[in-house]
Amino acid sequence: MSYPLEEVNKRRTFAIISHPDAGKTTITEKVLLYGNAIQTAGSVKGKGSAAHAKSDWMEMEKQRGISITTSVMQFPYNNCLVNLLDTPGHEDFSEDTYRTLTAVDSCLMVIDSAKGVEERTIKLMEVTRLRDTPIITFMNKLDRDIRDPMELLDEVENVLKIRCAPITWPIGCGKLFKGVYHLAKNETYLYQSGQGSTIQAVRVVKGLNNPELDVAVGDDLAQQLRDELELVQGASNEFEQDAFIKGELTPVFFGTALGNFGVDHFLDGLTQWAPKPQSRQADTRTVESAEEKFSGFVFKIQANMDPKHRDRVAFMRVVSGKYEKGMKLKHVRIGKDVVISDALTFMAGDRAHAEEAYAGDIIGLHNHGTIQIGDTFTQGETLKFTGIPNFAPELFRRIRLKDPLKQKQLLKGLVQLSEEGAVQVFRPLLNNDLIVGAVGVLQFDVVVLRLKTEYNVEAIYENVNVATARWVECADGKKFEEFKRKNEQNLALDGGDNLTYIAPTMVNLNLAQERYPDVVFYKTREH
């Protein structure tokens, strides 16, 4: 069988990054709608309503109306197969989000046009920089009053340090929003609000100086558009494929996801310009997506995707080759061969058994505790994919039991949740405390909820005097022993038994780093 490269070349795997409430979940819905993957897009507003958005599905997400876990959706568009990885947009779910960004080939950045660049977007962009991921930008919420579009582009360029190439340009906004002009095609698409799952047929006016344009949008807005475009074409960047692929330039689209307008414009851009599945660095060599032999890595583990089955699913990005049902793969970390007969493909929460999957696809493996984040699977070769990071937590709590007899279940639950990346656990060397570290407050709630529902353990938190944590290593054994002896009260083991320095204050950490220049304090570590 020759390896069908056309299957790989059809794949586009991307994630959406945004600040909470910029409209990411709505965009996810509408993308699926345009990809015919769902018939009714559940707009995400009514938190108490029965129609929950398709990609939000764990219990707590249903209650809070936020996407906590990363789901994966696949849909066809423009002769491509698009894999969309939905990343948690809420303040608190960053570590999972960060890791998901290691499994995609491009990102869609969604910006609320009334607000501009916000703090979470800045953080997520920093993570995409680790791999120079190509970025497409969608300026959302044009059906509301927005900031000046030129100002928005300037802000993206100055704050996020990426050049902007506008592809479409808005005509009016809020109640006066009339549509967008496509710079490359010299066409105006007139806005008619489509709600829910109604996609309106779009009226197109050809040419910027077409008198029909003045009739359609009014003389004032037509003239304003021509004036603005003169400025834009003088001041902004042309789209360059090369610079886009290197992550130096972003094509910018304007629209309103809620009004079903503009979503197809950026999807056209994504399928036309975004890279097909890319090669990936492993510890021994670079693995190309065109290789025939299968390889893939686990970037996320999620518990209880199926309330009916108490199970965990490991999400694996296929890097090369083809997955076929029943194939034998080597689980490199433990050196064992496993037969994978029941991998899953996803349409957020609806599971289907995968018969086959190609480079760029995401498949789910049933996990009974043997798979960890960062694990590599191959068809026999011993290699490990790199670049799946653990991030030092920023928030810490001591966790203890209401019923002290369940200490064993608590530890088991915490270690499993830490392998899954839901939280990090630290066990100080000098006492029996259990310290939980997270990148956001909401993770603490999730852990208590899941300990209760999955492990039947009732736990409560107490404040703990920890400001930050760093993984520590030292090449000089003698100096490391001295460091460990003198700092025992600040040392702990994490869920994977890695030595960690737990600092009560940032000042304490800085002093320790000055005092022990041979010890390396890591803010991130490879899984």
Swiss-Prot record:
GO terms for biological process: regulation of translational termination. Its main location: cytoplasm. It comes from the Bacteria. GO terms for cellular component: cytosol. Residues 9-278 form the tr-type G domain. GTP binds at residues 18-25, 86-90, 140-143. It is found in: Cytoplasm. Keywords: Cytoplasm, GTP-binding, Nucleotide-binding, Protein biosynthesis. InterPro entries: EF-G-like_DII, EFG_III/V, G_TR_CS, P-loop_NTPase, PrfC, RF3_C, RF3_dom_3_sf, RF3_GTP-bd. One of its GO terms (molecular function) is translation release factor activity, codon specific. Belongs to the TRAFAC class translation factor GTPase superfamily. Classic translation factor GTPase family. PrfC subfamily. Increases the formation of ribosomal termination complexes and stimulates activities of RF-1 and RF-2. It binds guanine nucleotides and has strong preference for UGA stop codons. It may interact directly with the ribosome. The stimulation of RF-1 and RF-2 is significantly reduced by GTP and GDP, but not by GMP. This is Peptide chain release factor 3.
